[in-house]
């Protein structure tokens, strides 16, 4: 799973500690802002995946495309996972939540969205690899760090005012 580490906010956290502010809430706000930028880039990468309508027969394997329905379902189920805080570090991930409306023999209630995303991102025996998550992370890394730093500084300013 791609990860981004934001350094350079030591001054913000030192000032927060000095005024007795809640450092973890500021960290979570910053992480959420940065992950929002990455989530938007993941959606953009999914929208750029090659699409082919209709059922693909076994002679078309491995697939180098996704169906419009798979694309729609991925975009619908993308989310920012709940945050985890350990030893002063806050982390989260971009994930795909729930089940799609794409039914199969093994999944009569719908395929897990994360399974569809993983098969497209990593490839499989019947699908060519399209690493959209890694491409999104690489494309949005600088903007995500910028957004996280901005959110942390805004939170500090609000705490100092109030």
Regions found by a protein language model. Give the residues of each.
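Short, Lys/Arg-rich flexible segments
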Residues: 1-92, 109, 113-162
